[in-house]
């Protein structure tokens, strides 16, 4: 099957019907219409990229209308909205170190693709076996289970669903990788998320930062300034 993935931002969300029509013309089987996740360069440009709540509602309604006209034919459309507007965090990577292991070009083994922004040391497959990394490495074990969780996660009856949310997102927004993901309405830092979403659609405070090969800014440096 052919799978297409489209990255949705505030700049192109109004074209979502055209995107679906193009997907049908290309005979795609599955199409993910996913709002960009705010890590790396998307985080750096978040004020430009984050759609408003109304834009997301309008886009989802357009997707549902298109689905209704398909009569069971054509691509399967999957609409993914950003968790910034949710009251509970996503179960990032299905829980830290439970399902995924990412190997980067330099051989670093990571529990998730963004984990290198965290103040942790990660192993390398050039030096250790995958079996040893998965079962014994400190970084992979660090956020497994719930013993690391702060309040309110520790006593929450939903902790086995969302695992405290995204460690990278908690770190980016609060500077503390142990904190409850600010997406959660129970988080003492939830006001940070509301402050971000309330600004969506307003004039950004700075220009878009484009990543160029000849003038590349490492993501770690960008994150360190936050």
Model-identified regions with their sequence ranges:
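Short microdomains enriched in Cys/His and/or Lys/Arg
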Residues: 173-196
